[in-house]
Design a protein with these regions (language model features):
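Conserved beta-strand termini and adjacent loop/short-helix elements that scaffold enzyme active sites
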Residues: 9, 55-57, 97
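Short, catalytically relevant binding-site loops at active-site mouths
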Residues: 14, 27, 57-62
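Short, solvent-exposed loop/helix junctions and linker helices
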Residues: 30-31, 108-111
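Active-site-adjacent beta-strand/loop module that shapes the phosphate/pyrophosphate-binding cleft
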Residues: 60-88, 93-100, 104, 111-125
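Acidic/histidine-enriched, glycine/proline-rich intrinsically disordered or flexible terminal extensions
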Residues: 124-135
Length: 135
């Protein structure tokens, strides 16, 4: 199966208001990162993750302006495209991979690391490359 889209949320809240970001949230005491991803995915999108996998755990340095000492767990799963209703987090859109791979995109949240995570997932899962960024 060719996966050509990623579900992103256009955030309603700061930080990154009106910017696209992955689905996520904070770990509740006693939860594993995978358990958190399953819960957050369902709470925000009503999508049940079946086979979530941990890609990377990253701790932001203490001198990072936005996220000092924050731990980021990047977890992914493959799901069928389904409509997700707008809610308190924002508007959900299935965006083409090329949108994420655009190095000049100004409306993607964070440190523009989303495209790097997608590249790594493709390598791990041996997914054929079907995107090319052309200026």
């Amino acid at each position: 199966k060719d996966y050509k889209k990623v579900l992103l949320v256009k955030r309603k809240k700061k930080p990154y208001e009106n910017m696209y970001n992955g689905i996520g949230g904070k770990i509740i005491d006693g939860e594993t990162p995978i358990e958190c991803a399953i819960r957050e995915s369902y709470e925000e999108t009503r999508i049940n993750l079946i086979n979530p996998k941990l890609l990377v755990t990253y701790t932001y340095p203490e001198d990072n302006v936005l996220n000092p000492g924050t731990v980021l767990n990047v977890i992914y799963d493959f799901v069928d495209e389904t409509e997700v209703e707008e809610n308190y987090e924002g508007t959900y859109e299935w965006k083409d991979i090329s949108f994420i791979m655009n190095p000049y995109a100004k409306d993607i949240a964070g440190l523009s690391n989303l495209n790097q995570f997608v590249k790594e997932i493709f390598e791990i899962e041996n997914i054929k490359k079907f995107y090319e960024w052309k200026e």
